[in-house]
């Protein structure tokens, strides 16, 4: 007599197999998620202290009373670079308009490029300021940027601090280039990390001075301080600085905190 095939038994076996496979996939997925979370949380994150928040709140409240287009404050410890930063809807107004609202040619105000984000989150942020030159007794605006064309000066003054209403950003000088004002390296937008790294690499090739301890990486953010040269107003000194990322911030501050203090010079 032929055996009757037990379809119900086969169906039960199939259901059990499916349940086991689904369970295994779920467990593996949970395991991967935990691994990712653990790896991410192992990176130190930077938290803005209450002391810093209070300081910045007071600082920018006072600056904004004088000029409501204030977006930042920039200083380079050990130099006389010590200026508020503004941004408006063009790159001409602050060439001669002072922070207080007057008009003084070859003084003006340090300003951010009109197309940059105010929060310094762009891959490349541009700040522009006049170089007062040797004929003027002060060091206002970006006069001291030109001094970075000497390697010894760069080595002694590596850091620049940007204060914003929300937090401070710290930068390390990477290299200084001397280029025509029409340089093709003046860009703000990049397709991806590779495109940005290519730009940085090409710019650095002909740099006048370099900080070789700064490794170029396409996922970093950079700041450029741009000013004219005294010998030729159509030539620019562009100081490229790497922003210290948050996952390096705690170690950076522990090592360099005393070198970063603000000392008023203006």
Give residue spans per PLM region.
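N-terminal secretory signal peptides that target proteins for export/translocation
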Residues: 1-7
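Solvent-exposed, non-transmembrane regions of membrane-associated and secreted proteins
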Residues: 35-266
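Short, conserved catalytic or interaction motifs in soluble domains
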Residues: 32
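Sec-dependent N-terminal signal peptides
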Residues: 8-20
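C-terminal motif of bacterial Sec signal peptides marking the signal peptidase cleavage site
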Residues: 26-29
């Amino acid at each position: 007599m032929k055996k009757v095939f037990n379809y119900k038994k086969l169906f039960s076996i199939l259901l059990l197999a499916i349940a086991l496979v689904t369970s295994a996939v779920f467990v593996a997925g949970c395991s991967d998620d935990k691994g990712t979370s653990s790896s991410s949380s192992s990176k130190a994150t930077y938290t803005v202290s209450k002391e810093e928040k209070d300081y910045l709140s007071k600082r920018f409240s006072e600056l904004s009373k004088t000029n409501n287009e204030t977006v930042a404050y920039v200083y380079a410890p050990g130099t006389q670079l010590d200026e508020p930063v503004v941004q408006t809807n063009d790159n001409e107004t602050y060439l001669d308009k002072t922070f207080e609202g007057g008009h003084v040619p070859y003084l003006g105000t340090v300003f951010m490029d009109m197309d940059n984000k105010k929060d310094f989150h762009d891959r490349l942020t541009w700040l522009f300021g006049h170089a007062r030159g040797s004929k003027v007794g002060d060091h206002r605006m970006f006069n001291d940027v030109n001094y970075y064309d000497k390697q010894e000066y760069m080595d002694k003054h590596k850091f620049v601090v940007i204060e914003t209403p929300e937090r401070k950003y710290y930068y390390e000088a990477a290299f200084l280039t001397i280029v025509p004002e029409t340089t093709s390296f003046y860009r703000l937008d990049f397709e991806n990390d590779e495109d940005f790294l290519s730009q940085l690499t090409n710019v650095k090739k002909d740099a006048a001075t370099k900080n070789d301890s700064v490794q170029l990486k396409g996922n970093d953010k950079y700041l450029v301080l741009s000013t004219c040269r005294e010998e030729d107003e159509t030539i620019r000194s562009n100081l490229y600085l790497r922003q210290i990322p948050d996952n390096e911030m705690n170690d950076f501050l522990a090592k360099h905190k005393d070198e970063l203090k603000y000392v008023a010079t203006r």
